[in-house]
């Protein structure tokens, strides 16, 4: 067996901006589960309960209680991911709802987090700032709270994911106590400080980010992907809103990825995280913008079809990866064993490190690496295929991929090459298994499990006036948007 090491991958926003459009795979029509109300068996429900609790504990145990900063990955030494902080702020509410922690514990952790971001240095320094113009750097040093390195961008989407948790906190902690009043005040001020039009050097689109020296990333958020939430929050701002027409500009590129893949017709984005992140906080069931009215398909239904197509792709398994099947599937941005090019029985194969894996009309990036969050974060969309998949992955691979914090980030049963690994380990008889969890992959698991169980996060966010305003300015109508706000 021969191998050669690949150069490191691009940072993910730049990588996604450079994806080549048009790769596709089509297989014969397969029998697929039909939509309907799925009822988990007692054994399945117990498995999901255990996964939710363990995944919550990852956030609770790894965050710095003084600043609220959540590591990008753990265990091990890591910088903080501001997106992971947003998922964590929301997970604390789930912890209260499920009885994992007390409300007072959640209040204290949330206050510490909001105080840190509210008071953090906002300037154009290369090394001594946490953010600028209300946005925050993608990665922060866990000790100083400043930009983790000069390669780190001021990120519009990661700031948005942080704000998802900030706005959740504003709407969840509604009691008339001094501490919960302060949570609401801090959260509101953090959101109001974001200067969305400044991040539009090529308006009406929003740039992916900025670096000191006035350099905006030369790529904008264009549909369809996780950038959806960026536009909703930018449109909903009471202080620095973007102008009308931005949502229409975002939607203008939809047609390039609308089509049929693996028997499902939907708006494609190959990695499943693009279908999950915005819908972790916003309930898109029954609400539609002009595009979804025209196609008679809401975004929740679109994400359901994306999950179904990935399962069908795994069943077809065109690249003959080990382990793929009806209950072992799921491609998204995750860690991996590479980068290496290895020659073996199936010819030359490329294995990546961290990258955006996926399968769709827009792109196929598949090296045999399965990320449990791809299925787990889709549980609210398609529980009848996700719950059996989570159960089977846990049963088949056991403690190698499942530990005190739930599933490890990823595993690859096709990779057995003995080499120096950047992360993870080789398990005899299984293959490569990661040794850490990532905050941005843990978040969709715990939050979407609770949305599937009780609509909890969705119900809280329906009360947020900025979310409602952003959706309405984007042209969404119907469903819960037409109903009065339900008090907690």
Give the positions of each predicted feature.
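N-terminal signal peptide c-region/cleavage motif recognized by signal peptidases
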Residues: 26-28
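Ser/Thr/Asn(+Pro)-rich, low-complexity disordered segments
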Residues: 32-488
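Bacterial N-terminal signal peptides
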Residues: 13-24
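Bacterial N-terminal signal peptides that target proteins for export
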Residues: 2-15
């Amino acid at each position: 067996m021969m191998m050669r090491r690949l150069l490191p991958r691009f940072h993910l926003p730049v990588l996604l901006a450079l994806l080549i459009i048009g790769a596709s795979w089509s297989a014969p029509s397969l029998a697929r589960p039909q939509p309907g109300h799925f009822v988990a068996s007692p054994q399945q429900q117990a498995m999901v309960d255990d996964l939710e609790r363990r995944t919550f504990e990852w956030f609770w145990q790894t965050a710095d209680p003084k600043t609220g900063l959540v590591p990008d990955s753990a265990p091990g030494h890591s910088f903080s991911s501001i997106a992971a902080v947003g998922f964590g702020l929301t997970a604390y509410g789930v912890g209260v709802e499920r009885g994992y922690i007390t409300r007072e514990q959640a209040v204290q952790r949330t206050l510490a987090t909001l105080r840190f971001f509210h008071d953090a240095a906002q300037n154009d320094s290369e090394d001594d700032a946490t953010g600028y113009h209300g946005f925050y750097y993608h990665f922060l040093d866990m000790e100083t709270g400043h930009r983790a390195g000069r390669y780190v961008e001021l990120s519009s989407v990661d700031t948005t994911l942080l704000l998802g948790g900030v706005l959740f906190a504003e709407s969840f902690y509604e009691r008339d106590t001094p501490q919960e009043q302060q949570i609401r005040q801090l959260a509101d001020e953090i959101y109001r400080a974001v200067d969305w039009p400044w991040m539009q050097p090529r308006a009406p689109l929003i740039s992916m980010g900025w670096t000191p020296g006035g350099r905006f990333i030369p790529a904008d958020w264009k549909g369809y992907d996780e950038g959806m939430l960026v536009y909703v929050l930018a449109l909903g701002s009471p202080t620095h809103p973007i102008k009308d027409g931005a949502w229409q500009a975002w939607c203008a590129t939809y047609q390039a990825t609308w089509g049929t893949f693996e028997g499902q017709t939907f708006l494609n984005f190959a990695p499943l995280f693009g279908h999950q992140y915005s819908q972790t906080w916003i309930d898109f069931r029954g609400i539609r913008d002009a595009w979804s009215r025209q196609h008679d398909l809401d975004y929740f239904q679109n994400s359901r079809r994306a999950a179904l197509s990935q399962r069908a792709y795994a069943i077809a398994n065109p690249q003959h990866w080990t382990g793929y099947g009806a209950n072992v599937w799921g491609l998204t941005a995750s860690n991996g064993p590479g980068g290496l090019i290895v020659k073996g029985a199936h010819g030359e194969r490329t294995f990546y490190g961290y990258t955006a894996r996926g399968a769709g009309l827009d792109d196929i990036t598949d090296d045999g690496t399965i990320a449990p969050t791809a299925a787990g974060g889709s549980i609210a969309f398609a529980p009848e295929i996700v719950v059996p998949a989570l159960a089977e992955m846990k049963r088949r691979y056991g403690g190698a991929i499942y530990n005190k914090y739930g599933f490890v980030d990823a595993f690859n049963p096709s990779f057995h090459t003995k080499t120096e690994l950047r992360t993870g380990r080789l398990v005899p008889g299984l293959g490569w298994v990661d040794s850490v969890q990532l905050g941005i992959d843990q978040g969709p698991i715990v939050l979407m499990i609770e949305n599937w169980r009780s609509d909890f996060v969705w119900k809280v966010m329906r009360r947020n006036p900025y979310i409602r305003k952003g959706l309405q300015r984007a042209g969404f109508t119907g469903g819960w948007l037409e109903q009065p706000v339900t008090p907690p």
